[in-house]
Amino acid sequence: MMASLGGDNSQAEGAEVRHVPVLIAEVIDALKPVSGAVIVDGTFGAGGYTRRILEAGADVIAIDRDPTAIEAGRAMEKQFPGRLDLVESRFSALDEAVSKVKGAGSKVDGVVLDIGVSSMQIDEAERGFSFQKDGPLDMRMSKKGPSAADVVNRLKTGDLARIFNFLGEERHAGRIARMIDKRRTAQPFTRTLDLANAIETLVGRNPKDRIHPATRVFQALRVYVNDELGELARALLAAERILKPGGRLVVVTFHSLEDRMVKRYFADRAGGSAGSRHLPETHVRLPSFTPAVKGAVGPTAEEEERNPRARSAKLRAGIRTENPPLEDDLSLFGLPKLPETNELARS
């Protein structure tokens, strides 16, 4: 599924060592896994968090919608017999995964979510996530649904601009969308470098810029293709339903859109009055979470030096109260209204 920008740095024997778990010490400190506990790793990826949780003595239900990640995790499953359950699924359905493994109505002691694309996926050109390596313009975490090429070549110009603007915070969104529309009529975009080079040619590149001109467009396409913001919103609500009182929800994000969603969620789940200064109070909402850490926790300078991909990482965490879950309300996340990918699939 949506795995980390890090991952496990102890791959199967003979594999290339590429994956470094991000904020691992901070995650374990916030999650506090102990022997006998059951923790859900909703974004298994290369298994960096799962391994540390298992080493701390807790059992893990690990979820990923990428079948490649699940298959790679079989070696770890053998290393920890009876303590690791791998489930191929979207992490928004983590409550269903827990029911499948532990039985209907089962609760868990912790949930960890690492929101972003795995370095394992970025590093494999054939997955189509990277603008630095040539590959098919795909970007799907699984092989289901429309690809990034489908989006680029088939969506209306205005819809593309909105996706680049809202999901990538790209200031040249309109110009890039119009360029794509003009070019795709004669020659559709099918390769990552083709799109990246076209964007760079259009907007130029200042030598002082730290990021490639295509970075935000590629981010927006990946987030849209995989419905990453919707997945995150539904996963947070699902975690609230399956955590025991005292259970911990730990979320690591890598860009501001996701961090704002998590911050807004924990603030909403702190409860309080349902009224406002304009309307009388209707009822008091009892908190479903209390803070496990103060604000957002970022990487140390040493980690940033060791792993540049950790620079933008932020960790937020909450502790489940004894109160019932609050209402499932996706509107609290402020998600932008964008075209449905299933409509694209039917077009």
Swiss-Prot record:
It comes from the Bacteria. InterPro entries: RsmH (IPR002903), SAM-dep_MeTrfase_MraW_recog (IPR023397), SAM-dependent_MTases_sf (IPR029063). S-adenosyl-L-methionine binds at G47, G48, Y49, D64, F91, D114, Q121. GO terms for biological process: rRNA base methylation. Keywords: Cytoplasm, Methyltransferase, rRNA processing, S-adenosyl-L-methionine, Transferase. Residues 291-347 are annotated as: Disordered. The keyword Nucleotide-binding does not apply. Transmembrane segments: none annotated. Its EC number is 2.1.1.199. Pfam families: Methyltransf_5. GO terms for molecular function: rRNA (cytosine-N4-)-methyltransferase activity. GO terms for cellular component: cytoplasm. Specifically methylates the N4 position of cytidine in position 1402 (C1402) of 16S rRNA. Belongs to the methyltransferase superfamily. RsmH family. This is Ribosomal RNA small subunit methyltransferase H. It comes from Brucella anthropi (strain ATCC 49188 / DSM 6882 / CCUG 24695 / JCM 21032 / LMG 3331 / NBRC 15819 / NCTC 12168 / Alc 37) (Ochrobactrum anthropi).
